[in-house]
């Protein structure tokens, strides 16, 4: 399949699942470049409303009628084979491209492509780098897996050769990209509905690194042994970061009352500058270092790096302050992997409060089943866990695992855990349990945020 972003502007492109965070960004890039765009999704959303206003033809529901006048159909890995639009496109020889291939074809039109990969932190790192490059007037095109206030959403159209995007390993999607700078934040066991094990995942990240040209750069975190090994084997230029034994390091770290870090940035033994982040948590020091490494490659001046990071508020759903009611602070976070949950709860410890209520909604049956033991060890920093039913997303319930099973295992390890089966049930429990100066975290990649929003709106 082929698509030339510059030459194919007379084509009409249809997106199956256009309401997704990545697909909507790609659709917006085309709309802003003069393309005719259509798309379908299963329910209405604010994203779809924005795309309509930009000129896209939007359909709610999937039907072959939606694609009878299109030249190219773009679909995601989450679209099932029995989707009627996908079937019609195949039967009628309409050109098809998956999302990753399509994004790769757009990247071809840029020289300085930055692809940010890793099991955790991609959106935050992309947000930080976006802030820096905008401060430095590099005028980048940006595709981010979350809503970022500084660009007014999940995409930005630039007019320069700089292109910044997240690079997801699910179904080897990022192997369709053309990175000049590749970032590997970390490697972890995830997407085990597709990968056999962590070794296969690591091998795929190695293949991603091999995509970088010899004059390009691979940036990686040396505290992750698998990333360190890929850095060692890389054929391109490399730049490592970490707390020690790396090219770029953070030293003399302290935290303020909001949980945000201040530290000195060193390259080898030379101090470059000192910095205070506006994103809380120790893990965000590493995210900042990765974005600093990219900035150094592009010769961004230190003042722009400092300003970009100190003013970066991050993307929505990344330890996002939602509000306060009756003295209870509500924060929402996208964490859905045990490592991410631990980082989120560790961050919450740095904020003065009494009890931490963690409302967690597991995301997919496969992840809950394959990482079950890891999930049972992820919540020790929460005073109470309110455990919702599993959010199925792209899967069907096989009956092999449930939130009740996870609740039993957590209670067996001494975690105070209450199972609930709806947003309203979670809300009622919290209304009766949370007290002034408590912290309420809604955690997960599904729709658990609704619980926090309803809690904030109680009595209105």
Curated annotation (Swiss-Prot):
Keywords carried by this UniProt record: ATP-binding, Cell cycle, Cell division, Cell shape, Cell wall biogenesis/degradation, Cytoplasm, Ligase, Nucleotide-binding, Peptidoglycan synthesis
Binding residue positions for ATP: 118-124
Pfam families xref list: Mur_ligase, Mur_ligase_C, Mur_ligase_M
Enzyme class of the recorded protein, top EC level: ligase
Gene3D superfamilies: Mur ligase, C-terminal domain, Mur-like, catalytic domain, NAD(P)-binding Rossmann-like Domain
Biological-process GO terms, alphabetical: cell division; cell wall organization; peptidoglycan biosynthetic process; regulation of cell shape
InterPro entries: Mur-like_cat_sf, Mur_ligase_C, Mur_ligase_C_dom_sf, Mur_ligase_cen, Mur_ligase_N, MurCDEF_pg_biosynth, UDP-N-AcMur_Ala_ligase_MurC
Molecular function terms from GO: ATP binding; UDP-N-acetylmuramate-L-alanine ligase activity
Keyword Acetylation: no
Signal peptide segment: none
Chief place where the protein resides: cytoplasm
Pathway named in the protein's UniProt entry: Cell wall biogenesis; peptidoglycan biosynthesis
EC number, UniProt record: 6.3.2.8
Subcellular location: Cytoplasm
Known catalytic reactions: UDP-N-acetyl-alpha-D-muramate + L-alanine + ATP = UDP-N-acetyl-alpha-D-muramoyl-L-alanine + ADP + phosphate + H(+)
GO CC list: cytoplasm
Cited PANTHER family: UDP-N-ACETYLMURAMATE--L-ALANINE LIGASE, UDP-N-ACETYLMURAMATE--L-ALANINE LIGASE-RELATED
Family recorded in the similarity comment: Belongs to the MurCDEF family.
Role this protein plays: Cell wall formation.
Protein name: UDP-N-acetylmuramate--L-alanine ligase
Origin species: Clostridium botulinum (strain Eklund 17B / Type B)
């Amino acid at each position: 399949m082929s698509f030339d972003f510059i030459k194919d502007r007379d084509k009409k492109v249809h997106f199956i699942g256009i309401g997704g965070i990545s697909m909507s960004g790609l659709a917006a890039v085309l709309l802003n470049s003069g393309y005719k765009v259509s798309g379908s999704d299963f329910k209405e959303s604010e994203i779809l409303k924005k795309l309509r206003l930009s000129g896209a033809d939007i359909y709610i529901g999937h039907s072959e009628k939606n694609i009878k006048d299109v030249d190219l159909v773009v679909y995601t890995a989450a679209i099932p084979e029995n989707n009627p639009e996908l079937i019609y496109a195949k039967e009628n020889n309409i050109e098809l491209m998956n999302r990753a291939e399509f994004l790769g074809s757009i990247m071809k039109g840029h020289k300085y492509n930055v692809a940010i990969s890793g099991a955790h932190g991609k959106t935050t790192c992309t947000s930080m780098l976006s802030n820096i490059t905008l401060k430095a007037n590099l005028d980048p095109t940006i595709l981010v897996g979350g809503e970022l206030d500084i660009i007014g959403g999940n995409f930005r159209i630039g007019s320069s050769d700089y292109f910044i995007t997240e690079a997801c390993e699910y179904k080897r999607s990022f192997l369709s990209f053309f990175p000049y700078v590749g970032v590997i934040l970390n490697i972890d066991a995830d997407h085990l509905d597709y990968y056999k094990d962590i070794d296969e995942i690591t091998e795929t990240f190695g293949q991603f690194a091999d995509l970088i040209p010899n004059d390009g750069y691979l940036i990686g975190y040396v505290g992750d042994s698998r990333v360190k090994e890929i850095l060692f084997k890389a054929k391109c230029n490399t730049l490592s970061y970490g707390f020690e034994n790396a090219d770029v390091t953070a030293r003399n770290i302290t935290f303020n009352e909001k949980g945000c870090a201040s530290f000195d940035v060193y390259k080898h033994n030379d101090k470059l500058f000192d910095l205070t982040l506006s994103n809380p948590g120790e893990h965000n020091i590493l995210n900042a270092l990765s974005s600093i490494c990219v900035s150094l490659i592009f010769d961004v001046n230190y003042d722009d790096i400092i300003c970009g990071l100190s003013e970066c508020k991050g993307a929505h759903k990344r330890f996002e302050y939602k509000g306060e009611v009756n003295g209870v602070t509500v924060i929402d976070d996208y964490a859905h992997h045990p490592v991410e949950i631990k980082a989120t709860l560790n961050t919450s410890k740095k904020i003065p409060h009494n009890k931490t209520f963690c409302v967690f909604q597991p995301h997919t049956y496969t992840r809950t089943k394959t990482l079950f033991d890891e999930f049972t060890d992820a919540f020790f920093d929460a005073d109470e866990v309110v455990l919702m039913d599993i959010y199925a997303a792209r899967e069907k319930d096989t009956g092999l695992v449930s939130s009740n099973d996870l609740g039993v295992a957590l209670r067996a390890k001494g975690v105070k855990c209450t199972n609930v089966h709806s947003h309203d049930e979670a809300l009622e429990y919290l209304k009766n349990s949370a007290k002034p100066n408590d912290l309420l975290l809604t955690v997960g990649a599904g729709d658990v945020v609704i619980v926090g929003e309803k809690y904030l709106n109680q009595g209105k």
